[in-house]
Amino acid sequence: MKLFLLLLWLPASMALTACDLSDRLSRQGEVIHDRLNHLEWQACSLGSQWQEGKGCVGTPALLTLLEAKDEAARLGEGWRLPTIEELFTLLDENCRMPMTDPRFFSDIHDNGENSAPYWTSSSIEEMPELVYYIDFMHGLIDGHTDRFAQAARLVRSHP
């Protein structure tokens, strides 16, 4: 019986430990440091607020691209929308719905359409009227017009 329970527990525990970005990410309050890519991420999506001891509180705001860029400019201090390459670094194929480590990015939620799209600052070269986004529920990359409302997470370079 003990062996049976161990065999049931083992795959579940392996699945829980497989989604782990702590080898390159660390948290300092509301900022996530990415040592590998020399970036700093806001722990909370725009619209959510960081509360010490609770993490991200609230729901990510759904913003047009211009609204997200305006919010980054308002915050200053080098915060900006990430490029497609930068945002892609937060995906981990070992993580499931969302496809990133929830210990670092806890406020990624289904927007009601079985997706969690996040803006990038990168236009699609072949169709410049479309801007890349990443769906963090499924790890899909696609493009949309800048007037579509999606979540946004800001980044800044870190020397």
Name what the model sees in each region.
Residues 1-5:
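Positively charged n-region of N-terminal signal peptides that target proteins for export
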Residues 17-33:
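Short acidic, Pro/Gly- and aromatic-enriched capping/linker segments at domain boundaries
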Residues 30, 35-80, 84-87, 91:
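Short aromatic-cysteine micro-motif
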Residues 38-41, 119, 154:
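Bulky hydrophobic/aromatic "packing anchor" residues in well-ordered structure
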Residues 66-78, 84-138, 142-144:
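An exposed tryptophan-centered "aromatic clamp" motif
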Residues 143-159:
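Short, structured beta-strand segments at or near domain termini in extracellular proteins/domains
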